[in-house]
Curated annotation (Swiss-Prot):
Its cofactor is heme. The chain crosses the membrane at residues 1-21. Its EC number is 1.14.-.-. This is Cytochrome P450 709B1. The lineage of its organism: Eukaryota, Viridiplantae, Streptophyta, Embryophyta, Tracheophyta. Its main location: membrane. CDD domains: CYP709 (cd20641). It comes from Arabidopsis thaliana (Mouse-ear cress). Disruption phenotype: No visible phenotype under normal growth conditions. Pfam families: p450. InterPro entries: Cyt_P450, Cyt_P450_CS, Cyt_P450_E_grp-I, Cyt_P450_sf, Cytochrome_P450_Monooxygen. GO terms for cellular component: membrane. It is found in: Membrane. It is an enzyme of class 1 (oxidoreductase).
Length: 519
């Protein structure tokens, strides 16, 4: 009996010893070796702190930067949103190493290196590890996070949903939803008993509601009312994610029944139940499922053969992905473009003149119209440059690999700070921080000193599948608004405080004064 106890103690000591050794390797030895290895290549950065890395510094800098309020005419938002990048770039150069907990991250801002990494088709750079809260938001089995053969299968199934013919059909939905919003604005303006009535609108909220209605109707055949629970759950999950961003992520803790985890689980369950109701409604009402995004996904569920088949769980996760991405990206693009046009009345008038010339004052826009709206395209591209959807892109090296002259160790995350690249004066000229749509007069590839200086939708095989949808939606909405209303000015209470809440958005909303155009 004593021997059994002795052997059990030996085994226990060995297990504990191995755990301690593993923790030592992760927390101390690997960071030490990697730091020295990169230092030999001339790459340095802030000192690594055991367990936390540089998260405490990042949290402090972000907290301080979020107290600042920018001048509305300032488009230099990089220091406010990514203050740690700005500080460390000034100290260590544009390529530096920092630590997100125990995760090593190398920052690069060279567009050629960015293009090489994002265009890799061999799986050498994969999506970097995401926090559990982010995965819950759009699903682990959706297009955002899956890799390899699964990603190829999903992309092949989903591509037809964003074909030119399908987008033409979606445009009619965009027009109908926008007309509803504009009719509400018109009714509100008629209540003003003045010769030149004005109305005040919180444009960020207006665009969030509109784009949610459009994606729910055009992609899922539901409506904003039916999809409202999905959107509400996702907004709550987004808040959970942004709250956790600057905290150390300990593997396994997402399974513990903590108050925050229980809240996330409830929201996830609520969101999926709402999606299941939409799916069930479609299954009962249509024998052929339809040809929109949801219909294409359901056809994949009943398809024979692995190459074109999807499970119900995969369909639910893709629905999460497109419910979120389908309205968040465009609503922010519309909000920032509205802000810029409110500040730059000359460009607002140029767009209106172009719209009246090519589309008239009442004709609803269509795919033929969009190809003629050159100035509109230039303004939207400039808005994407200054206030893109995301602040940075990240990929993890799945093998030891060379990127340019850099030897990137396996497991290292490479980060491209898009806000820095999109405002770099060496790429965009001395007016890089100014609103100047004319830089896109000869197309995107000639707007800067490098053809891939603008990465708002990324490049390569994992470029945003919905970028054409976003562009057409933005053009549709802006065209119809400018046909009927004028952005007079930003309201006095507007605070220019762009913030990174998964996507870049106005921290305190976007109140704008509008005036209906005279007939």
């Amino acid at each position: 009996m004593g021997l059994v106890i002795f052997l059990a103690l030996i085994v226990l000591i060995l297990i504990i010893g191995l755990r301690i050794f593993k923790a030592f390797m992760i927390l101390v030895w690997h960071p030490f070796v990697l730091t020295r290895r990169l230092k030999n290549q001339g790459i340095s950065g802030p000192n690594y702190r055991i367990f936390y890395g540089n998260l405490s510094e990042i949290k402090k800098m972000k907290r301080e930067s979020h107290l600042s309020i920018l001048d509305p005419s300032s488009n230099d938002i990089f220091p406010r949103i990514l203050p740690h990048y700005q500080k460390w770039m000034s100290q260590y150069g544009e390529t530096f190493l920092y630590w997100n907990g125990t995760e090593p991250r190398i920052c690069i801002s060279d567009p050629e290196l960015a293009k090489t990494m994002l265009s890799n088709k061999l799986g050498f750079f994969v999506k970097s590890k995401a926090r559990p809260e982010a995965v819950k938001l759009v699903g682990s089995k959706g297009l955002v996070f899956i890799e390899g053969a699964d990603w190829v299968r999903h992309r092949r199934i989903l591509n037809p949903a964003f074909s030119i013919d399908r987008l033409k059909i979606m445009t009619t939905v965009m027009v109908d939803c926008t007309l509803k919003m504009l009719e509400e604005w018109r009714k509100e303006s008629t209540k003003e008993e003045t010769e030149h009535p004005k109305i005040k609108k919180e444009m960020n909220e207006e665009f969030q509601r509109l784009t949610a209605d459009i994606i729910a109707t055009s992609a899922f055949g539901s409506s904003y009312v039916e999809g409202i629970e999905v959107f509400r759950s996702q907004m709550e999950l987004k808040r959970c994610y942004t709250t956790s961003l600057n905290q150390v992520s300990i593997p396994g803790t997402q399974y513990l029944p903590t108050p925050s985890n229980i809240r996330v689980w409830k929201l996830e369950r609520k969101m999926d139940n709402s999606i299941k109701r939409i799916i069930s409604s479609r299954l009962q009402s249509k024998s052929d499922y339809g040809d929109d995004l949801l219909g294409i996904l359901l056809k994949a569920y009943n398809t024979e053969g692995k190459e074109r088949k999807m499970s119900i769980e995969e369909i639910i996760h893709e629905c999460r992905t497109f419910f979120f991405g389908g309205h968040e990206t465009t609503s922010n693009l519309l909000a920032w473009t509205t802000m810029l046009l409110s500040l730059h009345q000359d460009w607002q008038e140029k767009l209106r003149e172009e719209i009246f010339k090519e589309c008239g004052k009442e004709k609803t826009p269509d795919s033929e119209t969009f190809s003629k709206l050159k100035l509109m395209n230039m303004v939207i591209m400039e808005s994407l440059r200054l206030y893109g959807p995301v602040s940075a892109l990240a990929r993890e090296a799945s093998v030891n690999i060379k990127l340019g002259d850099l030897e990137i160790p396996k497991g290292t995350t490479v980060v491209i700070p898009l806000l820095k690249m999109h405002s770099d004066k060496t790429l965009w000229g001395s007016d890089a921080d100014k609103f100047n749509p004319m830089r896109f007069a000869n197309g995107v590839s000639r707007a800067a000193n490098h053809p891939n200086a603008l990465l708002a939708f990324s490049v390569g095989p994992r470029a945003c599948i919905g970028q054409n949808f976003v562009m057409i939606e933005a053009k549709t909405v802006l065209t119809m608004i400018l046909q009927r209303f004028r952005f007079i000015s930003l309201c006095d209470e507007y605070k220019h405080t762009p913030v990174d809440n998964v996507t870049i958005q106005p921290q305190y909303g976007l109140p704008v004064m509008l005036q209906p155009l005279e007939d």
